[in-house]
């Protein structure tokens, strides 16, 4: 069965589209934080087609972890219905940052214009000074960009999907655009340590998120065949390879 999600670049700008409609293909575009300019031909979604059982078992993911190394950098490995990923709130050694918080009433984003928006016009930097008792308070309906504590690798014969952690645990949602392509974070392609970017939003009440708290799960799926191009290879322009706190490609970020 097919499965659709937002492109990472539109997700990291907090643009949400509903799925589930059967019939002629439409997209409901609902900006939550920034106003966006789209036009005929603008690319907001991506589609994966699956044949038969798609998700590999936890045992198979454990074997891949032992032979290939799917994630590293966390204190413990939690594989239950996918590989658990936790949030990193330790300040970056160079920038001192722990994340980004979207500004309200910011300008317009042209969805087809990469590197066209000044970061400071749209985002506030979060540092250790923003922590409360070692945690970060997520305010209702504000949008945050954080990073996983773990470094992630997707082997060439697999793809991965990041799924929200059990929504019964906590009133927040982490990561809306969940597709990871083969080659993501692969050292063989020259990638450095690559974290997963987490798009996080609290719902109705303030929510305290703490260092190392599990926020989502990464589920690996076998590819029908090895793709001709891998994420981050010399033929691609990959915005998130070797990433830390990486914003969408529309922003002028070093």
Each model region followed by its residue ranges:
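Single conserved hydrophobic/aromatic residue that forms the stacking wall/gate
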Residues: 1-12, 16
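Compact, glycine-rich, soluble single-domain proteins
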Residues: 10, 132-178
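Conserved, ordered domain cores of eukaryotic regulatory proteins
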Residues: 102-132, 137-149
